[in-house]
Amino acid sequence: MDNIIRFSVSLPSQLLDELDKKVSEQGYASRSEFTRDLIREKIVNDSWKDAKEELIGVLTLIYVHHQNDLINKMMDIEHDADVTIICTNHVHVDHHNCLETITLRGEAAKIEHFSDRIAGLKGVKFAKLTKAAVPKF
């Protein structure tokens, strides 16, 4: 691990109260741990802007599995994808709805394009792309 450098941050008291509440609710050992996670998250999100290196994304979907031809359209998009599909996980939520996660690897723009194509299909009720990258720090 790198050397830890201490620095100070000035916050309005109300914001500090909210910070302390989040630290406690989420079980962080300290404000520093919480702050480090926030900084890492910001760096990862910013790394997606115009990134050309290989990144990771997880597309979470909820869809109606009885929707006409939805599964076939999803499969066509997956098979034609310009990204690597690392794995998929399928859960039957109830008789009508399925939850699926698709773990993707590739360039940011290509992952986002893939996700947008799937999310736009009729019968997809919810779609969220979680952006990830292996921090270089």
Swiss-Prot record:
Q: Which GO terms describe its molecular function?
A: DNA binding; DNA-binding transcription factor activity; nickel cation binding
Q: Which cysteines are joined by disulfide bonds?
A: none
Give me the comment on cofactor binding. Answer: Binds 1 nickel ion per subunit.
Q: Enumerate the Pfam families for this protein.
A: NikR_C, RHH_1
**CDD domains, alphabetized:** RHH_NikR_HicB-like
Query: What protein name applies here?
Result: Putative nickel-responsive regulator
The similarity comment for this entry is:
Belongs to the transcriptional regulatory CopG/NikR family.
**Which residues are noted in the entry as Ni(2+)-binding?**
79, 90, 92, 98
- Origin species, per record, is Campylobacter curvus (strain 525.92)
Highest taxon of the source?
Bacteria
Which keywords does the record carry?
A: DNA-binding, Metal-binding, Nickel, Transcription, Transcription regulation
Its biological purpose is as follows: Transcriptional regulator.
Q: Does the keyword Transcription apply?
A: yes
Q: Which cofactor does it need?
A: Ni(2+)
GO terms, biological process? response to nickel cation
